[in-house]
Curated annotation (Swiss-Prot):
Keywords: ATP-binding, Membrane, Nucleotide-binding, Transmembrane, Transmembrane helix. GO terms for molecular function: ATP binding; transmembrane transporter activity. This is Uncharacterized membrane protein YJR124C. It comes from Saccharomyces cerevisiae (strain ATCC 204508 / S288c). Residues 1-50, 115-146, 206-260, 309-333, 408-416 are extracellular. The keyword ATP-binding applies. It holds the Pfam family MFS_1. It is a multi-pass membrane protein. ATP binds at residues 386-393. InterPro entries: MFS, MFS_dom, MFS_trans_sf.
Length: 448
């Protein structure tokens, strides 16, 4: 499987490689700000409950903007939407670098692109994943999505350690007199990487605008069929012959599947929102009094651990099918999350549980992408991925409010338990709704 990964990497089209570079820079940028956002807000005298509200409003704004941008991305132009997103990243970074005004920061956090954690925000993820689906055949998707997840996670890891080293260097050299000045310079670096990402988006070819209305030609692949839970099928890429297919409406079959997906992903994201990586940084900073370099090193290691799990995730998906693969990795991840606060007085054990959590938490990314791209009709894929990611972000909006309140009352540790419990619940719902399609998707993935 590993050699096959390298073959897919080497043989990938120029556009897919550019998309990999894009997700690398984006997650690197989010990794930078993830290390300092909660500490920055605390440094400008925001209370913990107010920080939680700030994060929730940021995510709520992302829901609204992402909904509009992803829903109309196909008609407005995917590349144009991605370039706009990069511009908003750049502006947000500049505002956070030069302002301490709560209202101004909140406006640019809501309408710009600032990640309250190292997770995805903005319209990028759903549009890029839809592009990859339309640029790659079914039998190559597990490896291509695994590489996509891998480079993103590596970017996030590098962002964490770069931030730690950068802040430590600023303090040692005297270039920044206070922690707050260091945090502002980190946001300036974020703006620079946003500009680099914008350049990459401008280099994408016209092929990234193609979708399910066009034939996918691959001399080694038979025409693949998307699966739905009712066993209905449709060609992977075909010419649209009915005006309804060119409209912005989803088919009835797609809406039925989408409702089930939303329940699963929103419960999962509700759990994730209770303890984002931004709050994890805050937890270790306050609970164990860790400095910037130590925090950067810790989350660099956790992100590397998470990155190393993305390749095995494609192997597990091929062997067991996407649904069983998700269950095998996500239930242990939830359990490890619950165990983290049990070691709140013993740092080495806490770090062990944290790394075990990160080792399993991202292993469901590839299986879930495979599930989505196999049960959704190609012409609906961009919109469905957009709605799913928006639903996930909306669900994540709820958690930070309660996290802030709990943190303000010295119960931040409880959020680990709530988070893990909700993730396990989402996995059980997934098993009930989609376990039956595993065998067919597995067969389609392993077709040569």
């Amino acid at each position: 499987m590993a050699p096959e990964i390298f073959v897919k990497f080497k043989c990938a089209s120029r556009d897919i490689k550019l998309l990999w570079a894009s997700v690398f820079l984006r997650l690197l940028s989010y990794g930078l700000t993830n290390q300092v956002l909660t500490l920055f807000l605390n440094a400008i005298n925001m209370t913990e409950d107010k920080i939680g509200l700030f994060m929730s409003l940021t995510l709520a704004g992302d829901v609204i903007c992402s909904y509009i941008l992803t829903w109309y991305a196909d008609s407005w132009g995917r590349r144009r939407v991605l370039v706009y997103g990069c511009a908003m990243m750049l502006l947000s970074g500049l505002v956070f670098s030069f302002s301490e005004n709560f209202t101004l920061l909140l406006v640019f956090a809501i309408f710009g692109v600032i990640s309250p954690s190292s997770d995805e925000v903005g319209p990028f993820k759903s549009i890029e994943e839809a592009m990859i689906a339309h640029l790659s055949p079914h039998n190559a998707r597990p490896e291509i999505y695994a590489i996509h997840a891998l480079v993103g996670t590596i970017g996030s890891a590098l962002g964490a350690i770069i931030c730690g080293i950068f802040v430590d260097l600023l303090k040692r050299t005297g270039l920044a007199a206070t922690d707050l000045q260091c945090y502002k310079l980190v946001f300036l670096l974020y703006a620079f990487f946003a500009f680099c990402k914008m350049v990459i988006m401008l280099l994408l070819s016209d092929a990234t605008e193609l979708d399910g209305h066009y034939e996918h030609t691959d001399c080694n692949e038979e025409t693949a069929e998307p699966l739905d839970v009712n066993d209905e099928t449709a060609p992977l890429m075909r010419q649209a012959t009915h005006p309804e297919e060119r409209s912005n409406k989803l088919s009835k079959e797609t809406v039925s599947v989408l409702m089930k997906l939303l329940v699963i992903f929103m419960v999962d994201s509700l759990g994730s929102g209770f303890m984002t990586s931004g709050w994890m940084v805050y937890y270790y900073s306050k609970q164990f009094l860790m400095g910037s370099l130590a925090l950067g090193t810790l989350f660099f290691i956790t992100q590397l651990v998470m990155a190393s799990s993305t390749i095995p995730s494609s192997i597990i998906a091929r062997c067991f099918g996407p649904v069983r693969a998700t269950l095998l990795v996500q239930i242990p991840s939830g359990i490890f999350s619950i165990l983290i606060p049990m070691a709140k007085n013993y740092l080495p054990l806490s770090i062990l549980f944290l790394n075990l959590h990160f080792a399993t938490t991202a292993m469901d990314v590839t299986p879930r992408q495979i599930l989505l791209t196999n049960i959704i009709k190609p012409r609906d894929l961009t919109k469905v991925m957009g709605v799913v990611n928006i639903g996930k972000t909306f669900a994540r909006c709820v958690g930070p409010i309660f996290t802030g309140i709990l943190a303000n009352n010295n119960y931040l540790w409880l959020c680990y338990i709530i988070s893990g419990s909700l993730v396990i619940t989402a996995d059980l719902i997934l098993a009930c709704m989609f376990l039956g399609v595993d065998a067919k998707i597995k067969k389609q993935m392993n077709r040569h």
